[in-house]
């Protein structure tokens, strides 16, 4: 069993036991002649909401300050999704880091979590992992005017365009393709995600 597979089993165990969504897996240092490089491995396993994402961003900030020579950040992801705006914020945060970003789907990357996965320069999935894309939804409670509903509809359309743009940028399919897929609601296997260009590599069990 390779290290990536062992990591996936560890996360499955932690989720079953209800443990915290944030883990610093490993900080690996390597000496390269005159300088030292650091590879940081961390997990995001939980809903994409403000509390979880803020904690995640703060932890990465702490790690990058502690290890300024970091050359790579690996993010292991298993998430049911959540808030699109918060996911986009994390996407941009990861993109702005001055190191290689590697995202790994260790179980399921659904809904808004796909935006976080897309931030990876290297995007990896385990063979049995999956991705789920669907239409933007919003829960509304209370009384609303026509203008209120129209405003919400415009916001949902804008978020749909935002997600489709991000996925088109990292894949070999255009925005229209991803919008159609979102409208239908579609579960993607690792192999299908690789065919679409969303995944760069599938890590086989060894």
Predicted regions: what they are:
Residues 1-206:
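Terminal-region recognition feature
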């Amino acid at each position: 069993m390779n290290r990536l597979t062992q990591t996936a089993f560890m996360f499955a165990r932690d989720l079953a036991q209800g443990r915290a969504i944030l883990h610093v897996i490993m900080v690996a240092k390597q000496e390269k002649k005159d300088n030292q490089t650091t590879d940081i491995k961390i997990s995001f396993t939980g809903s994409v909401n403000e509390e979880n994402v803020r904690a995640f961003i703060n932890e990465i900030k702490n790690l990058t300050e502690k290890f300024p020579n970091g050359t790579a950040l690996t993010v292991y992801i298993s998430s049911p999704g959540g808030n699109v705006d918060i996911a986009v914020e994390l996407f941009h945060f990861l993109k702005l880091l001055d190191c290689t970003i590697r995202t790994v789907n260790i179980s399921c990357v659904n809904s808004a979590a796909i935006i976080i996965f897309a931030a990876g320069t290297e995007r990896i999935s385990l063979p049995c992992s999956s991705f789920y894309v669907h239409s933007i939804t919003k829960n509304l409670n209370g009384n609303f005017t026509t203008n209120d509903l129209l405003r919400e509809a415009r916001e949902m359309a804008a978020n749909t365009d935002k997600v489709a743009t991000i996925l088109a940028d990292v894949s070999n399919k255009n925005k229209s393709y991803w919008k159609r897929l979102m409208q239908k609601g579609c579960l993607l296997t690792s192999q299908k995600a690789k065919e679409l260009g969303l995944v760069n590599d599938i890590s086989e069990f060894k």
